[in-house]
Swiss-Prot record:
GO terms for biological process: centriole replication; centrosome separation; mitotic cytokinetic process; regulation of cilium assembly. It comes from Homo sapiens. The keyword Cytoplasm applies. Residues 196-560 form a coiled coil. Required for centriole duplication. Inhibition of centriole duplication leading to defects in cytokinesis. This is Centrobin. Residues 365-903 are annotated as: Required for centrosome localization. Residues 572-590 have a biased composition (Pro residues). It is found in: Cytoplasm, Cytoskeleton, Microtubule organizing center, Centrosome, Centriole. Interacts with LYST. Widely expressed (at protein level). Highly expressed in testis. Also expressed in spleen, thymus, prostate, small intestine, colon and peripheral blood leukocytes. Residues 1-10 have a biased composition (Polar residues).
Amino acid sequence: MATSADSPSSPLGAEDLLSDSSEPPGLNQVSSEVTSQLYASLRLSRQAEATARAQLYLPSTSPPHEGLDGFAQELSRSLSVGLEKNLKKKDGSKHIFEMESVRGQLQTMLQTSRDTAYRDPLIPGAGSERREEDSFDSDSTATLLNTRPLQDLSPSSSAQALEELFPRYTSLRPGPPLNPPDFQGLRDALDSEHTRRKHCERHIQSLQTRVLELQQQLAVAVAADRKKDTMIEQLDKTLARVVEGWNRHEAERTEVLRGLQEEHQAAELTRSKQQETVTRLEQSLSEAMEALNREQESARLQQRERETLEEERQALTLRLEAEQQRCCVLQEERDAARAGQLSEHRELETLRAALEEERQTWAQQEHQLKEHYQALQEESQAQLEREKEKSQREAQAAWETQHQLALVQSEVRRLEGELDTARRERDALQLEMSLVQARYESQRIQLESELAVQLEQRVTERLAQAQESSLRQAASLREHHRKQLQDLSGQHQQELASQLAQFKVEMAEREERQQQVAEDYELRLAREQARVCELQSGNQQLEEQRVELVERLQAMLQAHWDEANQLLSTTLPPPNPPAPPAGPSSPGPQEPEKEERRVWTMPPMAVALKPVLQQSREARDELPGAPPVLCSSSSDLSLLLGPSFQSQHSFQPLEPKPDLTSSTAGAFSALGAFHPDHRAERPFPEEDPGPDGEGLLKQGLPPAQLEGLKNFLHQLLETVPQNNENPSVDLLPPKSGPLTVPSWEEAPQVPRIPPPVHKTKVPLAMASSLFRVPEPPSSHSQGSGPSSGSPERGGDGLTFPRQLMEVSQLLRLYQARGWGALPAEDLLLYLKRLEHSGTDGRGDNVPRRNTDSRLGEIPRKEIPSQAVPRRLATAPKTEKPPARKKSGHPAPSSMRSRGGVWR
């Protein structure tokens, strides 16, 4: 019964209908929900029954079960009120009583419903149909024949009724006919009978359908009544289980309370016994502590007495030491008087007799001292039990010995008075006295050691006894505490076991919740990961598009830049330009401020040059006599640039420059032959322009490329401020000889992603210093020939390739070590250092490789500086360039400008 009530398959349990108010609110809520569902089902069944009965009965008649419905409503109200009261009560007996009353009401309601069902049948065939278990075979012929639904609606089947219905047939008699038959009338009567019969059949069919509907409604009502009865029976059974569970719960509760009371009484008895034993143990411990305190006090008194005796002994030893010191002093006096003893030797011999007498007296005194020492020893042995009396007697003995010592000292003084007559005798007496004192001291030390040993033995014995008693008491206490701890540990283990079981249940629930949460988070994580993968793929596609666009832009800019270089290399200004006026040999400090010119310079290209131009000084001296070779006229460039560029004053035509081996275009073709990986901005590593840099101009540019080149040059020239002074400005340094590339400096082609294009505004003075290097002093500086009048001759033609070689080595070092692209700021600083430190090697006639060790140090120093962006502002005005010694040309610093060049 209890198992069925507690099983999850049962519709109602004991915990669901009756729950004490002390239970958690979850159980109350569950029980109230179950009860509400039960009553809702009852109400629905009653409503279905009421609707079925309303359809069965006519509107004039009233259903006979209105009293039963009212009784059921009152019962439901009483049940709801009782359940509400049950939520507030705490007594189980009241719940049981109310459950019994509810069961009685349910049984009466069930009995009344059965009685009314069997007592008031709706139709005569209802009882037989109930006995036949509500068979639904209403469509069968036997059922239709057995039922009599037309007794109340149709007339009875008696003879009169038949005669009324069929007057002609009833008039026919088996006897002879009264009148002759009328066939026409008979035919008409037959037709009328046919129509009447059809009408009757239709009426019978409609009545039968009505009967079938009523039978179906009756079956539904009966089924609803049976369902209601079964539900009431189930409720009665459930309430019986609840009552039985409550009775069993009350019995178990009383048994548990009785057991708990018995355990409480037993625990009180054990606690009282333990309290008594604890009080007894505390009393015994207090007594033991008092005895131990007394023993400690006696030991402390004995220690104090020993300390006093030790102090007296130390005082006596100090006095003896003083006497010994005096004896030493007397011995010294004796030694001093030995010189006079020789003369008195005879007198000493006469006094020997007196000395013998004195010896006898001293022997007697020694005997007396020995006897007195023996007496003291006996007294000390007799006084071992009482240490205080012994100490007093020992003090008395010490006082007597001190008195005797005083007597001896008086005798010594007397003998000192007679020292002149008996020095030797006195020495002997002193020796004997020292011996007696040593013996006395040794005996006294021995006595004190024996007394100390005996005292320590007694103290140790008493302490051992006290320790044994305390150990026994501690062992008994420990055993008692161990038993108590065992009992407490058993109870604690039981409580821990119950708590552990509860904790395991809670942990299992928590783990389930956490597992659900973890699954939810895993689902979210999987969704987010999928989303991240999609975003990463999209980002990768965008990055690829960006890289492709950057590469295209860099390729376009590189193509424009190559075309501009080729155009500038193939064009030359008109011949015979006016020579600039010669300045003083050493320009003053005010020259940069007076003569400022706007220089349109090429941006410095980070190209890789190898050590070239291995030529002698004589070959360079012979070359100025050669006629200059002009590549083209400036009209070609003016036609290319258009009137908008010609109107700008900052654009200056190029001066004719003599070339050693070929035209200036050849020099630029040599520039195009540099290593492609070491240019300033190289978009595609696979491109190699080859040795010819002006191939595009030789073949002819299409109009679209010419228009793009015009736009690019227009943007370059718009950044340069206009200046009308100094219309003749050198654009590029001379290139001497073909630029050969040795095979021992070839660097491996490492394809890498090019860096993005950066625009850095470099001061024009710094940019001009890259191409204008001070010329070293030469022997031809004073001449008036072309060698002294053109800046393309002399040291400039030698220093600039050397700087390019050093820059090429630096770039190759960056590439070989994998440090990436060289920043423009670091390259400018390095070139500036070369400009200031390059005066050492200007006197050399043959260009050589730079063996400076700073080439390996500068990359190491400049690599950390890449993390910090440095902006190079305009050069300070206080910085002065090195003075030129040539008289033909002013210093290049005079052509510096305060503007900037975009690179």
